[in-house]
Amino acid sequence: MIARSPSLEFLLIIRCTGARRPRINSFTLTTIAVDNHSPDPSIEELVIESAPHLQTLIHLDHNHDLHIAALSVPKLETLGCTNSTRLVFGSTDIRHHQGPCIRGLATAACKIKCLVLGMATLNLHMVIELMTNFPCLEKLYIQCQKSWKNNLWRRKYRGLITSTCFDIHLKTIVLDYYRGTKSDIDFVTFFVLNARVLERMKLLVKRNDDKFVAIHRHRLQLMNRASHGAHINFRLKDSDVCISNMYNFCIQENILNL
């Protein structure tokens, strides 16, 4: 099908049954998004043998495992994955157990500028581990199902923060969604107090009345933010419709350019 579509740029695979291990070779594709949720046997492995113009690769499903082997994707800049994703860039294996875990880096992984994470729990340790391995990362989008039990960081990451080997280059952070728990507050304040070039942070919430916003602007220490020009906003979370949570999130944030 792809070979017969020489102008195809965007490929959205949803509940595709029958083909468990499709292989892709395409000179024109710029975006691939996969939702392999299905009651019937669906895609288990996606092999991208060659996609020289691929810029965006996203796995949308939280609940069904998908092994993605990206063998040649030299222009890839936007990567989306969930707890059910296992990624291989060339010889670099990126595994997801309860969250992201990096095993070394390939050249393609080093060029990632935008990371979209579908996490079962909002876990600061896992996010920091990813950041230390993506040196060009500028945009971070996170959708989480619940808060992690503990995101304390001041003692644990004191040495890392002051290290010359670690610098946060993030300019954009979007969190879906912010519940206002102690764990959420600790997660967000890590970036508020340490992201020196941050330009925009959006926290999706289920209430943004004046009282809630005032309380949490104080708890998040926004007056002490490392980037004085950063715009930090609380936005009401939209209702989930359509294909999947990750899909809606990517559409709303213009990550998938349909």
Please give the residue ranges for each predicted region.
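Short, conserved loop/helix-junction motifs that constitute active-site signature segments
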Residues: 134, 163-168, 193-196
